[in-house]
Amino acid sequence: MAKHTCAICGAEVNLMSGQKLADGNYICRKNCGKKCFKALDKVSAHLPMITEHIAQIEKGTKIWNEVLLPLKKSKSKDEKLVEFGTSGGADLYVSPSTGLAALVETHYKIFVFGKYQKACVYRIGDLARYDYFEEEQKNSEGKMEKKHFMGLVFDNTTGMAAFNLQLPTKKACDALEKCFNEIFGIQKTVRNSLNNAKRQMDALKSVAGAVKAAAQGNLDEAAVTQAMGDVDAYVRGDRTEILAKADAILAKYR
């Protein structure tokens, strides 16, 4: 059986004990592979992504334990974490008060003993996509079951920047989408229709101004940047405040 070397720790591995990556490197399953999240597709990952993901978990777990986990027990409604997940899988905790979201895996060293958690922490404001999809999968009895997922993609993120979160029902997926929509101020309700209309008008004015400046031959970089920012705020919601909250927390962990 062919022998290879783990590109991270240097351990000798074979086809059974090693995981081959997309760039041809191998990592050991026993140690380095276990450091990664189950949600990470190691087959299509390259070595730099694996090492960045491991560093992402080390930092994220520290932030989870020191900042977010204590908020689970907070008596303040404004500080409470919003939890989304399914039994046996990773859970997503959304913290509007800190501007952070954490994907958390729970592990046990022996059966139900030696519980420990590891986490990837993201800035909510970096969330680029949160889309619902469903899949038909076989259960333990061989019968087909419909599984519900939310696909999340984050900008400005090294390591695992995208993952599929399995939730128990379509209703739970809708609740997660609503949670993010409310944070970004883009929920489709009468109460927020004026805010949405204002963002749309600001975007249209900026684009119109940029077009006029271009026609007059005096378009500058600031006008383009402003127009792009206003269009982005209309499509994605104004994320200035939620990003500022996250950066205030993360500054302590750089």
Task: Go through each PLM region and give its residues.
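Short, exposed beta-strand/loop patches in secreted or surface proteins that constitute
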Residues: G18, A90-V94, C120
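Secondary-structure transition/turn motif
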Residues: K30-C32, V104-K109, D155-T157
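Acidic, Ser/Thr- and proline-rich intrinsically disordered linker/docking segments
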Residues: A128-R254
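N-terminal cysteine/histidine-rich coordination modules
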Residues: M1-G60
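Glycine-centered tight beta-turn/hairpin loop motif at sheet-sheet or coil-to-beta transitions
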Residues: G85-G89, K115-Q117, T157-M160
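Anionic N-terminal interaction surfaces
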Residues: L40-T106
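Phosphoinositide-binding peripheral membrane targeting modules
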Residues: L100-K143
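Short, compositionally biased strand/turn segments
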Residues: G88-K115, V235-I242, A246-I249
